[in-house]
Regions:
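Short hydrophobic/Thr-rich beta-strand motif most characteristic of the beta2 strand and flanking loop
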Residues: 43-51, 58
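Non-catalytic signal-transmission and effector/linker regions of two-component phosphorelay proteins
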Residues: 1-22, 26, 150-154, 389-396
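Alpha4 helix (beta4-alpha4-beta5 surface) of REC/receiver domains from two-component response regulators
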Residues: 80, 103-118
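Conserved acidic segment of CheY-like receiver
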Residues: 17-30, 34-38, 67, 157, ...
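Conserved phosphotransfer microenvironments
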Residues: 52, 68-85, 92
């Protein structure tokens, strides 16, 4: 008996122009052309995104039958997006078409192993769009492919049917004893059951079968965090990042853990992997800047915070961090200038107003600071820090 029959896996939605499609492509013109052409073909194009990370968030919230994604999406590129869709228990993946440059044979094989259902090679011929999507969907729903069985197992996890999920993953393991992926699934089931030792055992089985399985190392790190094994968790995070150095979400998860444990220098080392790999994301520069600020290395902190702000000039959080850094470095005039720039955009931002008042106090401009603190309280009457600071400088 095949696994589809054994577990009563529902039949897939038949292919038609009514299927929902998400387009994720960094080039605006190509993204809009694809969206327009797909709509003309009758498909429901419910979102178009230029960021892989945003595309993933959209797909977690509103799954698509088919995803068309570019290989050069910022932060989370096409293959990384697919891997996240395959591995994340909260995600329901559909057919996946990768927009890519011409690939060497080994590159194409790696993409197929990652789960790509079909390719469209740049420059894209729109006449190929319908045949490629049709082929990709047929490949995804092919009963000889285990993908829908893995998706069924994930659906059991999402509905807290842990025994059902475990049974499917065990059957997948029996059908392919050399496969690493079922053991990651079994580790997730054990982790939800708070069986951390069993989860670690299963994820180690996965690593033994495939040492380059990035999500096995990432899950191992998550398990070790729960076991409060900080050093081992850091090593597992580092391994996952070295295998997949261009996935920004891996750095976000790792940095949250390291900084929570006050591992500042370890955080810098991890983030520098991204810089060396050429990852262009303001998160990397901002977090390195934060780490150097924590180490009181203000020149380096300013360098990276400025870099983050150049990449994302609309991010007033980055600007506020830079202003605080300048303040602590003794560059008070520059700090005030940065706060003024923020307040031109967000004139009622009372935390920024408060921070500006602190700098003015350091400049012995207490009357001006007092006016700003009173303005803070007008905006936020329960802002206790502003009340206390007014008392400290003797203004009622």
């Amino acid at each position: 008996m095949d696994l589809f029959t054994q577990f009563g896996i529902p039949e897939p939605t038949p292919f038609s122009g009514a299927l929902k499609v998400l387009v994720a492509e960094s080039h605006n013109e190509i993204r809009l052309i694809l969206s327009h052409h797909l709509t003309k073909l009758g498909f429901v194009v419910h979102r178009t995104e230029r960021s892989g990370k945003v595309a993933l968030a959209e797909l977690l919230n509103d799954p698509a039958h088919i995803t068309v994604a570019g290989d050069d999406l910022p932060g989370v590129a096409g293959l990384e997006l697919l891997r996240e869709l395959r591995e994340n228990p909260k995600a329901q993946r559909g057919a996946f078409v990768l927009l890519t440059k011409a690939l060497q044979k080994n590159e194409a094989m790696l993409a197929i192993e990652a789960g790509v259902d079909d390719f469209m090679v740049r420059p894209i011929a729109l006449t190929d769009l319908m045949p490629k999507i049709r082929t990709a969907y047929a490949n995804f729903v092919n009963p000889k492919s285990p993908e829908r069985v893995y998706e069924f197992a994930k659906s059991k996890l999402r509905t807290d049917d842990l025994n059902g999920a475990k049974a499917v993953y065990e059957a997948l393991s029996l059908s392919n004893p050399k496969a690493a992926r079922p053991h990651v699934g079994l580790a997730r089931v054990a982790l939800v059951n708070n069986q951390v030792d069993a989860a670690l055992k299963q994820v180690n089985f996965a690593v033994e079968r495939n040492a380059m399985y990035v999500h096995a190392h990432a899950l191992k790190a998550e398990i070790l965090v729960k076991m409060n094994k900080v050093t081992e968790a850091t090593e597992a995070f580092s391994t996952a990042i070295k295998i997949s150095p261009l996935n920004i979400m891996r750095y976000e998860q790792c940095c949250e853990f390291l900084l929570k444990n006050k591992l500042i220098n370890e955080t810098i080392s991890i983030l520098e992997i991204g810089l060396t790999a050429g990852l262009q994301d303001p998160f990397i520069a901002e977090r390195i800047g934060y780490c150097y600020f924590e180490n009181k290395d203000y020149p380096k902190a300013q360098k990276y915070l400025r870099q983050a702000l150049r990449t994302d000039p609309e991010n007033m959080g980055f600007a506020n961090s830079l202003a605080i850094c300048c303040r602590d470095a003794g560059l008070l005039d520059e700090s005030v200038e940065i706060y003024n720039t923020i307040l031109k955009r967000e004139n009622d931002n009372h935390p920024v107003l408060f921070n500006k008042a602190l700098v003015l106090i350091l400049q012995n401009k207490k009357d001006e600071a007092g006016k700003i603190l009173k303005r803070c309280l007008k905006i936020a009457p329960e802002f206790e820090k502003a009340k206390a600071k007014l008392g400290e400088i003797g203004i009622s």
